[in-house]
Amino acid sequence: MAEGLQLANGRRWENNHISPSKLDLWSKCSAAFWFRYVMRIRKPGKVWLPQGTAVHAGVEHLLNDLSAGIQRDKEYYELMAEVAWDEQVERSNGIVYDKKGNPMNSIQVDSAIEEAKYWFNGFYDAMQNGGTIEGFDPRDVTETEVDAIREVDWGPEGGPETYIRGYIDWVVDTSGPIAKLADLKTSNPNRRWGWSDKKADAQLQATAYGYLAGKPTDFDYIIIPKEEIFTASGVRKNNPTPVRPYRAKTRRTAVHYKAFINRLRAFVRDTDLHNNYADFKPWPNQKPTNYGWCDQLCDYKEECQAHFGG
């Protein structure tokens, strides 16, 4: 259960509520943070292949049912995944974009939905007959999508009122001396580009959520490989690679939390957070490329070049 976690309970987000994604964006590029959170430039709603969202929805419904002792057919969860897909698509006037930013036609959309269901089925099948994900038992998840918040303890140096806040995907147990949390990811099926314990060790999210728990934390990432069931020309494969979920794990301790607080302190100071960003001086952290202003994954390249490009 989420014992020991302070719940936000729908509380309004404030400037001094810092999520892992907010801190991570600033860490990668303060200019991107500035456009997003200070200038509040909103891009037109686009849905880029919401397969991951659909899979998450199916799995979340499954885990919530398991914790309540409810059993349903696989088709029910496939339907929940499709409903989540439809909700995402409604936000962009029914248009879904592929990985290259091109609008998808109805056949491509139907194929993408089928692929998302195939990935979910891999997770569902792995749990049958008492199965686990490399020793991690999703049946142990007690709560999903927990909106947690904690005021930052700056230590003897002190600091301004600041909170860490985030939606913890899966809470397993927070009552013992070591909290147990987890998160579901979909990933490249090539393990070279997928996940490992080393990649899990580098995740800011795991540190932030461990800090929310207020104690050492074992954090598991459960990975669903995005195996393709259609060829490049759109033909369904006769024998697609089976989806076999796997596990990447890491532990967070006081050492990690100390470094996390140091990063937070730098963030608060650099952004002038508690003075409504008045003295924030952002700069672009460009990734060099021969084909444009910057090769980072970012929604603000046009604005960035116009503002910082001279």
Question: How should each PLM-predicted stretch be described?
Answer:
Residues 1-18:
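Long, acidic, intrinsically disordered low-complexity segments
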Residues 51, 112, 116, 202-205:
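Hydrophobic (often cysteine-bearing) scaffold residues that line and stabilize catalytic clefts
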Residues 58-152:
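A non-catalytic, helix-rich entry segment at domain boundaries
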Residues 29-35, 178-185, 269-273:
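Active-site-adjacent bridging/hinge elements
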Residues 23-24, 28-67, 121, 145, ...:
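Nuclease catalytic cores
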Residues 52, 165-167, 216:
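Extracellular structured ligand-interaction cores
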Residues 138, 143-206, 212:
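Non-catalytic protein-protein interaction segments used by genome-maintenance enzymes to assemble
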Residues 17-18, 116, 198-199, 210-310:
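Metal-dependent nuclease catalytic regions and adjoining charged, substrate-binding loops involved
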